[in-house]
């Protein structure tokens, strides 16, 4: 069985990047929650 995590910078940015988070209301909610919690990194 192959390993499920095959890293790719492109795919990572496209699915979890900052701009993707900003697109939807839910994504912005995620960023705001992370800001409120004081996360050092908001998105990938």
UniProtKB/Swiss-Prot annotation:
Tagged with keyword Metal-binding: no
InterPro entries per the UniProt record, alphabetical: Ribosomal_bL34, Ribosomal_bL34_CS
Record GO biological process: translation
Pfam families: Ribosomal_L34 (PF00468)
Gene Ontology MF annotations: structural constituent of ribosome
Keywords, comma-separated and alphabetical: Ribonucleoprotein, Ribosomal protein
NCBIfam families: rpmH_bact
Stated name of the protein: Large ribosomal subunit protein bL34
Organism: Bordetella petrii (strain ATCC BAA-461 / DSM 12804 / CCUG 43448)
């Amino acid at each position: 069985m192959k390993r499920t995590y095959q890293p790719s910078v492109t795919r990572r940015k496209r699915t979890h990047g900052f701009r993707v988070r900003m697109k939807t209301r839910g994504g912005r909610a995620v960023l705001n929650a992370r800001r409120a919690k004081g996360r050092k990194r908001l998105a990938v």
